From Swiss-Prot:
Family, as annotated: Belongs to the universal ribosomal protein uL6 family.
A GO CC annotation given for this chain: cytosolic large ribosomal subunit
TM stretches of this protein: none
Protein known as: Large ribosomal subunit protein uL6
GO MF annotation terms: rRNA binding; structural constituent of ribosome
Role this protein plays: This protein binds to the 23S rRNA, and is important in its secondary structure. It is located near the subunit interface in the base of the L7/L12 stalk, and near the tRNA binding site of the peptidyltransferase center.
Keyword rRNA-binding belongs to the record: yes
Record GO biological process: cytoplasmic translation
UniProt-listed Pfam families: Ribosomal_L6
Keyword field contains RNA-binding: yes
Assembly and oligomerization: Part of the 50S ribosomal subunit.
Keywords: Ribonucleoprotein, Ribosomal protein, RNA-binding, rRNA-binding
Amino acid sequence: MSRIGKKPVVIPSGVTINVAAGNKVEVKGAKATLSKTFSTDVTFSVADNVATITPNNNSKNAVAQSGTARAILSNMVEGVSKGFERKLKIIGVGYRAKAQGNELNLTLGFSHPVVYKLPQGITAETPAPTEIILKGADKELLGKVASEVREYRKPEPYKGKGVRYEDEYVAKKEAKKK
């Protein structure tokens, strides 16, 4: 059986979990409200500030789904209580970013500025023109947004120019010699 799925999710104070019909789970907290529909192979039970996920049968798929559901529920609880953030760095001459409301204006060496509309629930800050901080309660959506912003200009392997995650290491290639 999955060891992750066996672990209960501790619910901090100020966070409530409601399980509706069809395995639709809603997590409410100080920062946001998140809801997700999970597989019918698992059953949720909430008691005494602890949520447990149990597989409906011992099939390989049900056990795998219990571990996945537990990890997602844990991320939802952490997201509505503390929130998540992802930092991006921009490296390159003239490469800049500026957050304006729910838009992110990127100057990445194209003939035109790139305007990225942030989805609801995600906020962006630019403490420096070469630094982007994305914040949100939904870890999955935050990762998707960070990936889409990075996709506009991935770090190239010769000089390392482009948009990268703060903790990302870019392996550099040696230039061709005559």
